[in-house]
Amino acid sequence: MNSPTASDPIVRTLDAPETKDMQEAFLPGESPQDVASVIQETMDIFDKRMRLTHPHCFCYVPSCPSPLAWVGDLFTSLYNVNAVSWDVSSGPSAMEQGMIRWLAQQVGLPPSAGGCFVSGGSMANLSAVVAARDKLLPPMRRAEGTIYTSDQTHISIKKCLHIIGFDEHQIRVIPTDHLFRMDTDILRRTIAADRQCGRLPFLVVASCGTTNTGSIDPLHALADVAEEEGLWLHVDGAYGASIALSDKYRHLVDGIGRADSISWDGHKWLFQTYGCGIVLTRDSASLAHSFAVDAEYINSTTPHGAVNFYNLSPELSRPARAMPLWFTLRVLGRRQMGEMIDQGFLLARTAEEEIRRYPHWVILAPVTASIVVFRYCPLGLKDDDLDTLNLALSARLLAENVASILTTNIRGRVALRFCATNPATQADTITKVVQQMDQMANTMPTCGLGMCKE
């Protein structure tokens, strides 16, 4: 499979009739089909997708996977190991255990740290908040438990809190400052007010690389609050924890190693195939306290120092998820992986500089990592009309195959969001895309939006 070029379509999407036709034509029948025709059908099915590896695809954090990850994934599927326990998977389990120690070291966790590979950030967050609940909340007081997030926290946190039984009224949403970082002063006051009302604060969720802007919460300050208040600090580093592998930008995540738990996605900024998620805990016993099980049909014997991963995760049967990442890092080394991450910083800063060169464009948030949020603001239009215009511009960029730059909401207003994590993309590509975007924006019809230009 060749990587797409700029002239290839960024996305191909089924419409309703095509969906019906595909489902009717390609579902299994009573008679066998020849392999060659089914391979062609497979390619036809996968052709209808967003090409995240396209050089003009800037819409999602999950990055272009390294070909090395494909090879590691191929071996993982080929051997089809059930990495559930040491007795059936001692080799892959040993490497998963080793990778957990190595990753924990990269983010500054102590030697006592542990963890496991999971399907992605959502499952990593779920595992971490279960561990926090079981460590700090007595079962009879769970209805009083209170969690502190920010207005930039990823939706997976709210989802996993709901799954494990917490109601909306138990979740505090702390405002962020002008840098889109959790406001620690408001956090302190909110915790104090909750204690006065008889509630039981137990968990603070920090973000290391928010999805909206790439912002990183003040990790040291939040760790101080958590330590002083006796709370569990979870850092959602699904996107930004990878910055720890960069020599040039590692300082941005200073303090992440003070967390009680960290979620991390290899399929975001470590260039892995889906699904490569990691949950790390400061204390290796934390996950076992929540997930360890036994049964008469489990006959696993574990040598001293080894691990049965079914005791560290909600899952029992599980693939050897660590192997593709191990394979990639074993070949590349940490330094080259860090340089690939650095390229995302370069591309984002190039985009910011180029956008600022043109009139009527506004950068809406500081560029921290590889995300730029911005807005086209020609004079004479109201905010609501600008929202409509930016939505239309995003749609047209994709429809005309210029770029996939989707939208988000920043402080209640529509913003264009650019995310560059493909290490193969060069800065001159960004320059050309921004130029094309500006040219297109200047030709957008604005009749009915307070001014008339067609």
Curated annotation (Swiss-Prot):
The modification N6-(pyridoxal phosphate)lysine is found at K268. Its cofactor is pyridoxal 5'-phosphate. SUPFAM superfamilies: PLP-dependent transferases. It catalyses: L-tryptophan + H(+) = tryptamine + CO2. Keywords: Decarboxylase, Lyase, Pyridoxal phosphate. InterPro entries: Aromatic_deC (IPR010977), PyrdxlP-dep_de-COase (IPR002129), PyrdxlP-dep_Trfase (IPR015424), PyrdxlP-dep_Trfase_major (IPR015421), PyrdxlP-dep_Trfase_small (IPR015422), Pyridoxal-P_BS (IPR021115). It is an enzyme of class 4 (lyase). Belongs to the group II decarboxylase family. Its EC number is 4.1.1.105. Disulfide bonds: none annotated. It comes from Penicillium expansum (Blue mold rot fungus). This is L-tryptophan decarboxylase cnsB. Disruption phenotype: Abolishes the biosynthesis of communesins A and B and leads to the accumulation of aurantioclavine. Pathway: Alkaloid biosynthesis. One of its GO terms (molecular function) is L-tryptophan decarboxylase activity. L-tryptophan decarboxylase; part of the gene cluster that mediates the biosynthesis of communesins, a prominent class of indole alkaloids with great potential as pharmaceuticals. Communesins are biosynthesized by the coupling of tryptamine and aurantioclavine, two building blocks derived from L-tryptophan.
